[in-house]
UniProtKB/Swiss-Prot annotation:
This is ATP-citrate synthase. It comes from Rattus norvegicus (Rat). The active site is at H759. The modification Phosphoserine is found at S263, S450, S454, S458, S480, S662, S838, S1099. The modification Phosphothreonine is found at T446, T638. Its cofactor is Mg(2+).
């Protein structure tokens, strides 16, 4: 959500810190918080003024009218405060319909004052700007401030000065206090704007001869502005409304939501409830809650929540397991119900999200059966058949009753089934989302008709008018429709061209496929803009043909080279969507902008709206999937994949236009309208934010003026008053076409505490903003309003059939659309094709949520403390080695890490480093010296000693044989060390191996060889390379993890040399860093260390 309430303490703390005013604000930071865990001695240490002043105490839990409820203790001593708190702190209280525990109180100094010194100030945000309210009589009996207070609208981007405040607000204020009040209100407004508040009320504001006192404060901030205000806000807390506890599970989901590009929401309403929901989509989640409450389940509804925006399988698993954990804590005598519902997704891979839910169900299958949980599933969208299949399979394998339904079932029908004694039979669905591969004109579930013109070209004035309006609406509650001067009634046509901001290749390909199936002459996407790469071209498909679409770094270049473009689809993130949209509106050719991002601060959205109105630009969004005009154009992912485009007949125009807030619900409307009428003419999802760029009425008026539109469908929502404009339009005769409308969110009036639904704007701030009030007003105005969302399809069909009967709509002949090839990647995901891979790997898999080494998740690697040796065992040998083997590998890496700067590898590395080369170049220079003469002895010694040992010849015979053949025994001999001056590296390794290895036959053989060679020359010892070689073979052969064939294969393919390469790389890097640290210059070898031996005839 966007606007969130903060505690009084938080509001005052921010105000005292950041308000800038000449008025003397008293009692700054003088407040003390008391909870059941408060240590009074510690509190007095921090706030010594508690002992010396009269005090006021009150709960700080978002409770309104505390004074009227007797929840304010006034003019008390500290002992009086303690006595006053005793029957209240930690005890239950009832406020309206809400019951909750009082556990957070605020103590402040008592301010003696008269009634004449109390004032009321409030600032709140609207679409047009911010209203400032002032009343000269504040306090507990202030009454209806909307009618009594002086009110001033400060427009978007306008400033509030002291003179305006005095002239418009302080009309009735005492003369001697006007200067102080004007300065304070001016500073308060600037503070409100700077810290992105959406609501700020002070009542009473007390002004005495000493200065200004802020007694009671209530506030909301725009939570989406966190990335802007983080420095000033700090870690701000958003307490739950009174009557609802804050649960750690809610905080956990909020944390997941904050770390994800998807949307994850959870509110616990009644943890003991019988009915639990796990719904996809901000709009759909509200509709399911409405339906449950309509059927009498309000007291059994346990939670509200939603997941949307294509969460990954892991994110959905985390979300699902949280809900399953909560619902299996307490048993219910009638068992429990889990509704896994959702509308038809636009771009979320249903199978991927369902696999996450299925994992959670498997993990909790025992608890689910113990608590007698029955699960009802309904979903549609990309790959939904596979999702439904895996959901049905888990029901069969676990024994949990899971009833699965697809798009052929009405979205909320499963709620009724949960109460019904019998479950209807589920008709078989296709095995995959690939219906568009074949001409499906014979199928009832996926019709394949097509056309490029409207069914009827009859005039708008021939359409049956809406029902006569009843004069019941108060004038001030129904603002007149906003002027559309300068804005086109037609946003899209068959020739519309768009620029897409953002590297959204999947969305662009979806638009091109839609264009192709609509038989457009050219693709609708002319270019893309992506500031993070240089100019280039991106490959896409136009039917079977490959095409190139240019990608520009700068928007100016894209606009200049494509003057025919008049639509921009903005996929920028919430942080850059504002700036990129503002830049777009500098180009006069752009008439429509769709903003997809969710989470743009409301204050910035209002600035976008103001500039768009000035420029005559229509904005769709923010927080939207976009819109669609069948047969012409679609925005981004709107309408989902091609199978849904065909099933909902979106490739050709119908006669019904709709507008909704929700993207998912707009796709559900596509489905409903296609099954009950001749199809969609145009549909727009204006977005779930509080201030959408264009409103319901903007689009309803467009549809009214469009001859091809014969009836209008509006899916309204709780929050805001835009739907009342439709009532006004009918009353004034501006709207004559039939309008079907239903406002979702009717359940909100049944809850005892306020619930913020999935959309930022879905929250009623007054009675007129509730869905129930709006539905009633619409009905009285003559709009066709169903009794519930369940009946929406029936009333749409009834109105449509009436228009057909009157001849206003003449159904046209259907024509099959062209077939479109399926993308290779999607076909592979659906399991329709297979292809031999070019590469194979068996040691690492990075594709899932967690990196996996040879089958072991990285979390397990750290949990088991496997170390570098253990990781090498997994990556080199595909298995988990014994602990001593891992330790031995690590010891080998340590002893081979370096051997001084004089050896060839280190020498090369140093020379490269001093020549100014980078780390990788210097390192590879050193590594390239490793071979038979340097570093290669590990492999050679292992092979040579193994061959001799396995052939059965005794050590003396082996030494004699090598001498006879004139070959050196690899791994024997050292330039400095000898039998009398042993190499401590070898000694350390030998002690470890003898202590931990189960058997060391090859090492024993090599030590016998050493006895023979050192008897002739004391430095012919088994050196560190030879020791590691033979000991490694012993480890491979005797640790129990390998067969003899596997052990020999690893020696043959050079695994042992890898130990030296990896170990010595550490030393080479050390030498590189050392030279850079010492700032050594270019190395040139001295002449006197070089013998110039030239041919004799040349030197003469």
């Amino acid at each position: 959500m966007s606007a969130k309430a903060i505690s009084e303490q938080t509001g005052k703390e921010l105000l005292y810190k950041y308000i800038c005013t000449t008025s003397a604000i008293q009692n700054r930071f003088k407040y003390a918080r008391v909870t059941p865990d408060t240590d009074w001695a510690h509190l007095l240490q921090d706030h010594p003024w508690l002992l010396s002043q009269s005090l006021v105490v009150k709960p700080d839990q978002l409770i309104k009218r505390r004074g009227k409820l007797g929840l304010v203790g006034v003019n008390l001593s500290l002992d009086g405060v303690k006595s006053w708190l005793k029957p209240r702190l930690g005890h239950e209280a009832t406020v309206g319909k809400a019951k909750g525990f009082l556990k957070n109180f605020l103590i402040e100094p008592f301010v003696p004052h008269s009634q004449a010194e109390e004032f009321y100030v409030c600032i709140y945000a609207t679409r047009e700007g911010d209203y400032v309210l002032f009343h000269h009589e504040g306090g507990v009996d202030v009454g209806d401030v909307d009618t009594k207070a002086q009110k001033l609208l400060v427009g978007v981007d306008e400033k509030l000065n002291a003179e305006d405040i005095k002239r418009h607000l302080l009309v009735h204020a005492p003369e001697d206090k006007k200067e102080i009040l004007a300065s304070f209100i001016s500073g308060l407004f600037n503070f409100y704007e700077d810290l992105y508040f959406t609501y700020l009320e002070i009542n009473p504001l007390v002004v005495t001869k000493d200065g200004v006192y802020i007694l009671d404060l209530a506030a909301k901030v725009d939570a989406t502005a966190d990335y802007i205000c983080k420095v000033k806000w700090g870690d701000i807390e958003f307490p739950p409304p009174f009557g609802r506890e804050a649960y750690p599970e809610e905080a956990y989901i909020a944390d997941l939501d904050a770390k994800s590009g998807a949307s994850l929401k959870l509110t616990l309403l009644n943890p003991k409830g019988r009915i639990w929901t796990m719904v996809a989509g901000g709009g759909a989640s509200v509709v399911y809650s409405d339906t449950i409450c309509d059927l009498g389940g309000v007291n059994e509804l346990a939670n509200y929540g939603e997941y949307s925006g294509a969460p990954s399988e892991q994110q959905t698993y985390d979300y699902a397991k949280t809900i399953l954990s909560l619902m299996t804590r307490e048993k219910h005598p009638d068992g429990k119900i889990l509704i896994i519902g959702g509308s038809i997704a636009n771009f979320t891979n249903v199978a991927a999200t369902f696999k996450g839910i299925v994992r959670a169900i498997r993990d909790y299958q025992g608890s689910l059966k113990e608590h007698e949980v029955t699960i009802f599933v309904r979903r549609g969208g990309p790959n939904y058949q596979e999702g439904l299949r895996v959901m049905g399979e888990v029901g069969k394998t676990t024994g949990i009753p899971i009833h699965v339904f697809g798009t052929e079932t009405h979205m909320t029908a499963i709620v009724g089934m949960a109460w019904a004694p019998a479950i209807p039979n589920q008709p078989p669905t296709a095995a995959h989302t690939a219906n568009f591969l074949l001409n499906a004109s014979g199928s009832t579930s996926t019709p394949a008709p097509s056309r490029t013109a409207s069914f009827s070209e009859s005039r708008a004035d021939e359409v049956a008018p809406a029902k006569k309006a009843k004069p019941a609406m108060p004038q001030d509650s129904v603002p007149s429709p906003r002027s559309l001067q300068g804005k086109s009634a037609t946003l899209f046509s068959r020739h519309t061209k768009a620029i897409v901001w953002g590297m959204q290749t999947r969305a662009v390909q979806g638009m091109l496929d839609f264009d192709y199936v609509c038989s457009r002459d050219e693709p609708s996407v002319a270019a893309m803009v992506y500031p993070f790469t240089g100019d280039h071209k991106q490959k896409f498909y136009w039917g079977h043909k490959e095409i190139l679409i240019p990608v520009f770094k700068n928007m100016a270049d894209a606009m200049k080279k494509h003057p025919e473009v008049d639509v921009l689809i903005n996929f920028a993130s919430l942080r850059s969507a504002y700036d990129s949209t503002m830049e777009t509106m500098n180009y006069a050719q752009i008439r429509t902008i769709a903003i997809i991002a969710e989470g743009i601060p409301e204050a910035l959205t209002r600035k976008l709206i103001k500039k768009a109105d000035q420029k005559g630009v229509t904005i769709i969004g923010p927080a939207t999937v976009g819109g669609i005009k069948p047969g012409c154009f679609k925005i981004g992912n709107t309408g989902g994949m091609l199978d849904n485009i065909l099933a909902s007949k979106l490739y050709r125009p119908g006669s019904v236009a709709y507008v909704s807030r929700s993207g998912g619900m707009s796709n559900e409307l596509n489905n409903i309208i296609s099954r009950t009428t001749d199809g969609v003419y145009e549909g727009v999802a204006i977005g779930g934010d509080r201030y959408p760029g264009s409103t319901f009425m903007d689009h309803v008026l467009r549809y009214q003026d469009t001859p091809g539109v014969k009836m209008i469908v509006v899916l309204g929502e709780i929050g805001g008053t835009e739907e009342y404009k439709i009532c006004r339009g009918i009353k004034e005769g501006r709207l004559t076409k039939p309008v079907v409308c239903w406002c979702i969110g009717t359940c909100a009036t049944m809850f005892s505490s306020e619930v913020q639904f999935g959309h930022a704007g879905a929250c009623a701030n007054q009675a007129s903003e509730t869905a129930v009030a709006k539905n009633q007003a619409l009905k009285e105005a003559g709009v066709f309003v169903p009794r519930s969302f369940d009946e929406l399809g029936e009333i749409i069909q009834s109105v449509y059939e009436d228009l057909v009967a009157k001849g206003a709509i003449v159904p046209a002949q259907e024509v099959p659309p062209p077939t479109v090839p399926m993308d290779y990647s999607w076909a592979r995901e659906l399991g329709l094709i297979r292809k031999p891979a070019s590469f194979m790997t068996s040691i690492c898999d990075e594709r899932g949520q967690e990196l996996i080494y040879a089958g072991m998740p990285i979390t397990e690697v750290f949990k088991e403390e496997m170390g570098i040796g253990g990781v090498l065992g997994l990556l080199w040998f595909q298995r988990r080695l014994p602990k001593y083997s891992c330790q031995f590998i690590e010891m080998c890496l340590m002893v081979t890490a370096d051997h001084g700067p004089a050896v060839s590898g280190a020498h090369n590395t140093i020379i490269c480093a001093r020549a100014g080369k980078d780390l990788v170049s210097s390192l590879t220079s050193g590594l390239l010296t490793i071979g038979d003469r340097f570093g290669g002895a590990l492999d050679a010694a292992a092979k040579m000693f193994s061959k001799a040992f396995d052939s059965g010849i005794i050590p003396m015979e082996f030494v004699n044989k090598m001498k006879k053949e004139g070959k050196l025994i690899m791994g024997i001999g050292h330039r400095v060390k000898s039998i009398n001056n042993p190499d401590m590296r070898v000694q350390i390794l030998k002690d470890f191996v003898k202590q931990h290895f189960p058997a060391t036959p090859l090492l024993d053989y090599a030590l016998e060889v050493e006895k023979i060679t050192t008897s002739k020359k004391p430095n012919l010892i088994l050196n560190v390379d030879g020791f590691i070689g033979v000991a490694f073979v012993d480890m491979l052969r005797n640790c129990g993890s390998f067969t003899r064939e596997e052990a020999d294969e690893y020696v043959d393919i050079g695994a042992l040399n890898g130990v030296f390469v990896l170990g010595r790389s550490m030393g080479f890097i050390g030498h590189y860093l050392d030279q850079k640290r010492l700032k050594q210059g270019l190395y040139r070898h001295p002449w006197d260390d070089i013998s110039y031996v030239l041919p004799e005839h040349m030197s003469m």
